[in-house]
Amino acid sequence: MGDKMLSKTCRDENFFKVFKELKHSQSLNLPNNNKLEMYYTKIMNNKFDYTALIELLCENITNYVFSRKENLEASEKRKISNLTIKAIKEFRKIKNEDDNGSGGELGEILLYTFLESRLNAFKLLSKMELKTNSSDYIKGADGIYLYEYEDE
């Protein structure tokens, strides 16, 4: 690809304040150079530190839910806080613990954070950008990402 036409949208400067890599020496025994990276949320006082995770997700909610264009327009008009409120409203409300699909959208924003932060796979489109009703749980792909494979 050479020149980068896209850049990542994820604000990931706090990624390693939230996640710690689990080091290992295991191999996947595949013919190519694939590797397995594992992470866990940092632990503070023998408990997972969810506060830092929530902050990381909140820093990225508008970039995940809305397109680059919508984020740029809101930024130029200094209306990012309005866009943040709108983004939060897009998340599906959990009705009860048996609610099908509850919490799935949090998994989607986590996936987005990992893909952009660790793989430099840039978001082209998220499923959230296509939603027309916040109570709907849309099944299927969580998003479309562009990953440039570099042959070693």
Segments (PLM) and residue ranges:
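A structured, charge-rich N-terminal accessory region that forms the first stable segment of a protein
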Residues: 2-86
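Generic hydrophobic, aliphatic-rich segments that mediate packing or membrane embedding
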Residues: 53, 83, 107-111, 139
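Short secondary-structure junctions and interdomain/linker hinges
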Residues: 64-71, 94, 98, 122
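A short, surface-exposed helix-loop junction/capping segment
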Residues: 79-100
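Acidic-basic catalytic patches of nuclease active cores, encompassing PD-(D/E)XK
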Residues: 96-128
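Catalytic centers of nucleases
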Residues: 124-152
